[in-house]
Amino acid sequence: MSFTLTNKNVIFVAGLGGIGLDTSKELLKRDLKNLVILDRIENPAAIAELKAINPKVTVTFYPYDVTVPIAETTKLLKTIFAQLKTVDVLINGAGILDDHQIERTIAVNYTGLVNTTTAILDFWDKRKGGPGGIICNIGSVTGFNAIYQVPVYSGTKAAVVNFTSSLAKLAPITGVTAYTVNPGITRTTLVHKFNSWLDVEPQVAEKLLAHPTQPSLACAENFVKAIELNQNGAIWKLDLGTLEAIQWTKHWDSGI
């Protein structure tokens, strides 16, 4: 079911990152009503740049670290919902790539995403009288097939794909739909230099960037196309400037 972003309210977690910033710019071209950016690092210059792209869209920034307790996330969302009244889309985009930082990688890439999602269900869940909503979770192609030298990062992205697929199946109960966008290797600061697990491959970043990559702008354009296609349960691959829906192979079924 296609979805128009015109006049919609969007919360973008990590909307100032590499792919995030370019995606925010693309979103603004769609004449949103509000773009609310939640990010750990304040970047007034980037916010000013975004505001200048489309003055018709209200761009708001709140500092947010996805590793905070869920009660703090709920408190922040209360502030946002009080201001906007409705929120149509949540984009969960926080991520780090550094397999030296095991606990933080899991906390940012997976636990933080789960907690932010859980918190917004307080406002969206139709069982609580909520209107429903749309969740777009940023995964990675490493969630399909790992970069084995960074197994912690790859494992968190596989978890994001699995969690989001479950959210999509719960949509008849909650009224909240969900899908993942999974970028391939994209030229951002995230991949210029990073650490492998236990230093199993000191040159992992250099070796990765020796293979075909995509610019973040091409990824951002397909990112927004995926949002507009709005397919509950979709597992989108955004690689080498293309957008493709992955057909996931079912090897087991719980039967419930």
Swiss-Prot record:
The active site is at Y153. Changing P215S: In allele Adh-F-CHD and allele Adh-71K. Changing C136A: No decrease in activity. Its EC number is 1.1.1.1. The keyword Metal-binding does not apply. This is Alcohol dehydrogenase. Belongs to the short-chain dehydrogenases/reductases (SDR) family. NAD(+) binds at residues 12-41, 65, 157. The modification N-acetylserine is found at S2. Changing A71S: In strain: NC16. It comes from Drosophila melanogaster. Keywords: Acetylation, NAD, Oxidoreductase. Changing G130C: Complete loss of activity. InterPro entries: ADH_Drosophila-type (IPR002425), NAD(P)-bd_dom_sf (IPR036291), Sc_DH/Rdtase_CS (IPR020904), SDR_fam (IPR002347). Substrate binds at S140. GO terms for cellular component: cytosol. Changing G15D: In Adh-N11; loss of activity. Changing G15V: Complete loss of activity. The keyword NAD applies. Changing K157R: Retains only 2.2% activity. GO terms for molecular function: alcohol dehydrogenase (NAD+) activity; aldehyde dehydrogenase (NAD+) activity; protein homodimerization activity. One of its GO terms (biological process) is acetaldehyde metabolic process. It catalyses: a primary alcohol + NAD(+) = an aldehyde + NADH + H(+); a secondary alcohol + NAD(+) = a ketone + NADH + H(+). Homodimer.
